[in-house]
């Protein structure tokens, strides 16, 4: 009989080891980036946390206690990451900014009013190509709806977006130069 984990993340990670305790995410919790390449993934995560909690975490390159620390370390497979959450903070390691973003999307799903559960998560995709399509040739979608769709793809670690723009003479993108 399989043990049911209290940690629910979509898609299901390769490995989840639960531990006792939680890390309290507060307005003073910084996101420490150990490489400037990680600034954009950190900004995306900070925006998501702001939407969930109402406060925007600061992004810094200076080590700090009780922080979310992002490390680029060679040796991981493409898009593979390791996330370790303890009572004292969160460490996320991977070899690419894309893999760090995947780890941050997992961390985003772990955030709750009770805090971030202590755990170790190791994950990598089973398939290199994970895609989804949006067909705007048959139905109109407002720009904000398309952006929300892309954000949801990112949250679920989908790495290819197929945007079906047209089936025939109908063109759904405004081009100022041509009528």
PLM features per residue range, with description:
Residues 93-94, 130-143:
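The substrate-binding groove and active-site-proximal loops of carbohydrate-active enzymes
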Residues 42-43, 143-147:
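Conserved strand-to-helix beginnings and helix N-cap segments that scaffold or border functional pockets
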Residues 107-110, 135, 140, 152, ...:
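Mid-sequence acidic-hydrophobic segments that form the walls
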Residues 37, 138, 165-167:
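A mature extracytoplasmic/lumenal domain signature
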Residues 169-179:
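Aromatic- and acidic-residue-enriched carbohydrate-binding clefts of CAZyme catalytic domains
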Residues 145-168:
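Catalytic domains of carbohydrate-active enzymes, especially glycoside hydrolases
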Residues 1-130:
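Contiguous, structured surface segment used for ligand recognition
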Residues 39, 100, 140-142, 171:
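Residue-level signal for secondary-structure boundary sites
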């Amino acid at each position: 009989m399989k043990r049911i984990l209290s940690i629910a993340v979509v898609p299901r990670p390769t490995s989840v080891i639960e531990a006792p305790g939680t890390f309290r995410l507060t307005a003073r919790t910084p996101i420490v980036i150990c490489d400037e390449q990680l600034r954009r993934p950190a900004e995306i995560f900070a925006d998501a946390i702001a939407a969930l909690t109402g406060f925007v975490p600061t992004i810094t390159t200076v080590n700090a206690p009780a922080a979310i620390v992002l490390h680029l370390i060679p040796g991981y497979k493409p898009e593979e990451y390791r996330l370790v959450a303890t009572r004292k903070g969160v460490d996320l390691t991977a070899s690419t900014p894309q893999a760090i973003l995947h780890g941050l999307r997992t961390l985003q799903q772990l955030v709750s009013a009770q805090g971030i559960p202590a755990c170790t998560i190791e994950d990598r995709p089973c398939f290199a190509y994970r895609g989804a399509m949006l067909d705007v040739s048959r139905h109109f979608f407002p720009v904000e709806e398309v952006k929300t769709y892309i954000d949801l793809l990112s949250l679920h670690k989908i790495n290819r977006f197929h945007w079906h723009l047209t089936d025939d003479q109908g063109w759904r993108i405004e081009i100022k130069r041509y009528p």
